[in-house]
């Protein structure tokens, strides 16, 4: 089974996907093996999701906003300040909300077998942003979804939807003044080398990374192994949550020095 990982995926995401693959292989006594193809080799998030829906790829990983293009109800997850905590956000997709999403996904020909996450997003900027008024006129890169664009417009900023890979150059060239993502991304992508000198903890949105498995691949798993398979995938997702927390804690410590 091939699982695709996007080009801008954090290192801990790829590591967690491989942990999940190892857990699946062990739990099924080698009956199910997952080959994680990282680095966007198989295409971007939208491309690989399309491949999974068409049955040409076993597992695609993407931001929840990408899947929302097919499941409009998921757009609610892009709303600003939706969750108070990571536990609250994770509970939602592990229970009723997750079941509803999977019901919709199955009509597309895919199964959502787990959720990794990019987690809460914060703001990185060239000038300190300490109050809501400081957002006025700031050109900030956001994800390509209406929820984030609307949120930052309401703050008084000028949001610009750019692909993740374009952020560094846009900061360098002055096309944008700020960007937003998980705080660890500021360091993974070395935005401080492109002029970022301030990190503002906003936690304005929470981003999931659903694992979408094609019907073709799902139907190849023996019925007596399906539950074991999904449990192992979820165990890998929970490991990724921990990896992300550790990376963000380290980034928070670095950000304290950046802001000083």
Regions found by a protein language model. Name each.
Residues 1-88, 96-99, 103-260:
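N-terminal secretory/targeting leader peptides
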